[in-house]
Amino acid sequence: MSRVRSGVTGHLARLMVAFAMVLSVCAQAAAAPDVTNPAVVEAFVDGVVKTNMQQHHSPSGVVAVMKGGEIIFSKGYGFIDVEKRTPVDPATSLFRPGSISKLFTWVSVMQQVERGKLDLDVDVNQYLKTFQIEDTWPGQPVTLRHILTHTGGFEDGGLGYLIIDNPDRIIPLAESLAKSQPVRVNPPGEHTAYSNWATALAGLIVANVSGVPFNDYVQQNIFDVLGMKYASFVEPLPPELDVHMAKAYGYKPDQYTEINYEIISNFGPAGAMAASAHDMTRFARALLNGGADGDNRILKAETLQQILDEGFVHDERVRGMALGFLERRFGPDGFDNFGHDGGTTVFLSHFGLSLQEDFMLFSSFSGPGGGMVHGAFVKAFYDEFFPREITVITPPADFAERAGRYAGTFNSWRSNFSKIESLMRALSGLKVTPLPDNTLMIGPKRYVEVDNNLFRQVDGYERVAFQQDADGKITGLVIDGMGVMQYYRAPFYETAAFTGILVGFSLLVFLGVFLRLGYQWAAYRALQGAEKMAFRASIAVAASNTLFLVFAGVGVSGGMTALMYEIPAVLKFSLIFPVLATLAALWHGVMSVTYWREGFGASVWARVRYSLVSLAALAMAWFYIYWNLLGFNYFS
């Protein structure tokens, strides 16, 4: 009797559990709007996009949503020509998807792998004709697999040469890559560091082994095959496509100002494409359908699967790289978003796919506020239509005992290490700070520990995995969904705080030299011999350092866009002064010895004050040397 009752009770319990699970699934389904309903999608997209475009001054944008091989929603926002009020047409209007162009380069590489002309695991130097990658790490050559996963070990770079706005500066791809070959700062296969140069190199390799210039190759083997009539890597655009191009605009108070078409031809395979939203759906349809859109095939199904299965990841608990494609964190478990984002100085774009949902989202927004619209829209769309449950996590009570091991500043391996732009590394570090509530502040967001060296955003699903060495010391971190952005733990002298203190202290010291010269002008003129020479050394140090900071400040005042297009002449001129300042620092150091030995100055404090000038001068000399400001090491 009791056994029967117990069995019935157990059966009822199991039914209740099953019923609860069904209700939970239904509730989740009900909570997610129907992404196959065009009216529902349009209402959401309009609500986010229109407001943000107006608020952030984005003159044009486009969104396309595809599911099950069918375009559910596509719509243009704003105007491709503001003056003529020409509206955006998602079928024909071209946008600049930036690094989404790389996916066409990776498909081209894998086509040549299919044809037996390329091997992912051999030294790429055997595919190069006019130059070779430097043998920085003997016995460790760079391979196409390294290039596809951004683990080639190259430093990053781009100021003054990656994107230009003058077609007269276009040079052949091989010449451009030879001229701008980056330093190999790491052995291949160890660290991820996004590389436009390496991607462009992959495009050159495709051209070399196929015997067809890269732009023509993509046109013949992808665009023509898929019927992508409104897509091109050619710069400037052919006239028949240029009339459909969303113009590039800046924004001054109350009006848009047209700017030149961005030229990326010198590194074209990394980002030179222009394409319409509907043409991007054709590309997506092939990727979601085993490499073919109907009878139009660009890859074998097994090759596409290889792209998705093989790649690189630093920590299996966070998403890393497929072969060229980024694995994204959007959507619930099983959604497995992959694709790429892309940005030029004018356009910000997203291209996301899910095989499980047979789904694609493409968006692109232009203008100075395009990035703000992009940031507000993309994640919000996935969270709306493909929500991910966010559970409340209580921070471990004992986390405070180990929180300090994570504290510090972390710099990206996607940085420059040999040229003037390396200084950006010191200004863009990711700061990690333990908080009293047993959480970590990583950048602007709070995270809670969920596993050993693994943290989840408190009010979101973003994850960060820290890395440690054999001794258990934290050495770096990787962010879920950003597989090409590995960070290393920065030494104190590579942080913004230290840099600010060093430069600020030196400026105060140099200001003191000028003030002292002003109120002791008569005493200065009365000085004789070595003592006057010592004072002149202080003037030389203060003047050369101050002039560098003044001219460099003017040189960068035009903003990052101007620096991307070309290094301004005034910034080039400013680089004379670090050389003079370093020589003056050495001179001042020698004179400081003389100052003490000869007993110059009215008191011991005067001699200490003079030594402080030497200290500031030598500190700035180190600053110039370490951050590659001593000389004219830039590409133009």
What residues fall within each predicted segment?
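Bacterial N-terminal signal peptides
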Residues: 13-24
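Short, conserved catalytic-motif segment at the N-terminal edge
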Residues: 35-95, 117-119, 126, 134, ...
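Active-site SXXK
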Residues: 46-49, 63, 69, 96-124, ...
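Peripheral terminal and inter-domain segments
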Residues: 30-32, 372-636
